[in-house]
């Protein structure tokens, strides 16, 4: 039976909405990409950060799973360096002298009847399309790698082991790893830390994609606030939010949507979304879309009946105050997101605020109910690659304090997206989305 009356102002049934979400996701799957020059600049920067040697990276060979509704998604770092969204490719970079080669599988006529035409290494425009100096067949990687490796000592950077689905053509690297060809000759190093340091600083194109994801997802949150009422299911609100960001160009959710009401507002990674919202409860909505591979991460908390109780408002305002305290404490090049007693930790600022404002039913401070970190970097992954460096220009991250009291069935989290611009200013990318308790209540009025 369709839930025709579920969304106020909408006449779709739930089944229709889910269908529309999937159709919109498929329609949006033609991922936008940056200019080839942007990806090349990243490869050159990575080569400069390497201590000599060569880098070898492989794309996964298959989709995420046999029943994956959203299709293949490229591995984050491979996409960051290549802009290539299809499976079964590889990249080889030598640091000095700089050499870059992209490897593609040969055309497979039978397979392409199922998957559609693919760019092959023999295509005359392969170099132009990919933006690489040279494009070769995957079968030639073995020979190309041997041409590059120096003697008597070779360093090979890779991220083998981070990909569950490894291409058959990883053979050359595995061959070197075993030392069958050059015993005591090849030293392997992990490329992930080097790539992470690059990925944590976003360029203008990346920031724009994140803004697109954020704006589309904000529309989903606004629609949800208008639609929430006693008796509606968490799943309906989740579907509505995905519909709204899907119709604005997001190809998929950036993570499993979380819509938890009542007791489930206190469960951090609750993803069943299968309960009916009850009068007097709050609902936590942690939902964001992915635009052209780039994520956003937004959370809002709302009263199911449109009006916070006095106790809910008290907890909400403490969480809001903690976020405001962290924002005001931000210092360029000094503040950190990580937990710890360090006075430069924004987490400590938020925690101290929560722990000195309000009590639980047993008159204990509320700090113990703030059970997660304050924030994380966002980019190609919703919990993006980074290192513990202080916050600086070009970084995109969340600030998301929360209080979760199971005994009272009250969970409150407020999560916003932030970017540090080239002037060193902290910019809230979710500016305009209802954030105070009063703004949330006003947005829910019909």
For every predicted segment, state its role.
Residues 1-3, 9, 26-446:
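Active-site neighborhoods and metal-handling regions in enzymes and metal-associated proteins
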């Amino acid at each position: 039976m369709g839930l025709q009356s579920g969304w106020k102002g909408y006449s779709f049934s739930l089944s229709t909405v889910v269908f529309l979400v999937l159709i919109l996701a498929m329609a949006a799957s033609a991922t936008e990409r940056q200019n080839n020059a942007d990806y090349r600049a990243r490869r050159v920067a990575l080569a400069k950060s390497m201590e000599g040697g060569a880098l070898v990276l492989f794309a996964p060979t298959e989709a995420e799973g046999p029943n994956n509704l959203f299709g293949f998604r490229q591995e984050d770092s491979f996409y960051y360096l290549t802009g290539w969204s299809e499976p079964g490719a590889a990249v080889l970079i030598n640091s000095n002298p700089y050499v870059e080669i992209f490897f593609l599988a040969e055309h497979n006529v039978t397979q392409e009847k199922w998957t559609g035409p693919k760019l092959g290494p023999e295509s005359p425009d392969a170099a132009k399309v990919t933006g690489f100096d040279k494009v070769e067949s995957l079968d030639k990687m073995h020979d190309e790698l041997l041409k590059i490796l120096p003697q008597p000592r070779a360093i090979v950077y890779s991220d083998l082991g981070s990909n569950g689905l490894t291409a058959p053509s990883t053979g050359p690297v595995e061959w070197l790893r075993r030392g069958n060809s050059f015993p005591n000759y090849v030293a392997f190093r992990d490329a992930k830390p080097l790539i992470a340091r690059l990925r944590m600083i976003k360029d203008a194109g990346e920031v724009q994609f994140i803004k697109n994801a954020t704006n589309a997802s904000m529309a989903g949150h606004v629609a949800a606030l208008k639609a929430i009422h006693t008796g509606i299911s968490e799943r309906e609100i989740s579907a509505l939010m995905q519909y709204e960001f899907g119709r604005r160009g997001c190809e998929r959710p950036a993570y499993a949507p979380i819509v938890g009401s009542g007791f489930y507002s206190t469960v951090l990674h609750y993803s069943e979304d299968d309960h009916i919202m009850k009068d007097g409860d709050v609902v936590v909505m942690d939902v964001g879309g992915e635009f052209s591979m780039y994520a956003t991460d937004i959370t809002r908390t709302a009263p199911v009946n449109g009006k916070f109780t006095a106790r809910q408002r008290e907890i909400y305002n403490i969480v809001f105050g903690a976020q405001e305290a962290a924002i005001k404490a931000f210092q360029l090049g000094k503040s950190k997101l990580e937990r710890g007693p360090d006075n430069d930790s924004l987490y400590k600022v938020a925690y101290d605020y929560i722990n000195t404002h309000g009590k639980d039913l047993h008159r204990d401070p509320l700090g113990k109910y703030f059970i997660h970190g304050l924030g994380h970097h966002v980019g190609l992954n919703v919990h993006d690659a980074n290192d513990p460096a202080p916050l600086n220009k070009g970084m995109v991250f969340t600030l998301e304090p929360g209080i979760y009291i199971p005994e009272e069935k009250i969970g409150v989290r407020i999560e916003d997206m932030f970017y540090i611009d080239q002037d060193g200013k902290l910019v809230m990318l979710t500016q305009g989305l209802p954030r105070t308790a009063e703004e949330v209540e006003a947005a829910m009025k019909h």
